[in-house]
Amino acid sequence: MRVHAIEAFDDNYIWAIETNDKDKVIIVDPGEAQPVQQWLEQNSKSIETILVTHHHYDHTGGIAELIEQSPCPVIGPENPEIKTLTKTVTEGDELTVGGIQWQVLTTPGHTLDHISFYTPGFLFCGDTLFSGGCGRMFEGTPEQFTQSLLKLRKLPGETRVFCAHEYTQANVNFALKVEPENAVLQSYAEKVRMLREQEQITLPSTLQLELAINPFLRFDQKSVIAAANKHAESVKNSPEDVFYTIRQWKDNA
């Protein structure tokens, strides 16, 4: 399965997924219409279906214009703020879109309505999980966000992670504050630095890599727990408390 990144705004990625029909693509989280329209024209493609992970405008703002130009199904979480949906989905739903079998995972935390789309080898997780980080906790609770991340941790390690923002360099710089002696993280940070110096994309990541370097997936590791306790100057042992401590640390960094 081939996936293409369409850059939008300052740091968003809209994903274009090739389907069994060589002339059509699935578009994930089109926050802006113009970059998608330009990419479609340059590549002689049209949209089969739009997938939406959550209601934030930088993930949905381009939908109305795109479907006005070329009507297509729009699939996403149940939320009245997403007025363009033609089908709502939730945990456990299975879809066939573009000849591809998809599983829907509810992943609240960043927002309450957040979902992710998974097909073997590929995860489209919006703002739940970033390379080296995770989304800000705007609506959910630490318990909800932790459960969402635990759910993603169970996916196969070779799963490629397609998140929605180019935040990797800032994320790994923060991760190094949490685990400065993590050799895998040190190596990855250097790779990311070189890619960004060349204005190259750092995504997709893999779940195996994220499990080795991402403090928001490593909240039960001794080194991350110790860093959280040191930062908070108190004992934080539960996954939820450790996660919340490092999330607040990152928010205020």
Curated annotation (Swiss-Prot):
Keywords: Hydrolase, Metal-binding, Zinc. CDD domains: hydroxyacylglutathione_hydrolase_MBL-fold. Zn(2+) 2 binds at D58, H59, D127, H165. One of its GO terms (molecular function) is metal ion binding. Its cofactor is Zn(2+). Binds 2 Zn(2+) ions per subunit. Zn(2+) 1 binds at H54, H56, H110, D127. Pathway: Secondary metabolite metabolism; methylglyoxal degradation; (R)-lactate from methylglyoxal: step 2/2. GO terms for biological process: methylglyoxal catabolic process to D-lactate via S-lactoyl-glutathione. Transmembrane segments: none annotated. It catalyses: an S-(2-hydroxyacyl)glutathione + H2O = a 2-hydroxy carboxylate + glutathione + H(+). InterPro entries: Clx_II_MBL, Glyoxalase_II_hydrolase, HAGH_C, Hydroxyacylglutathione_Hdrlase, Metallo-B-lactamas, RibonucZ/Hydroxyglut_hydro. Monomer. Thiolesterase that catalyzes the hydrolysis of S-D-lactoyl-glutathione to form glutathione and D-lactic acid. This is Hydroxyacylglutathione hydrolase. It comes from Idiomarina loihiensis (strain ATCC BAA-735 / DSM 15497 / L2-TR).
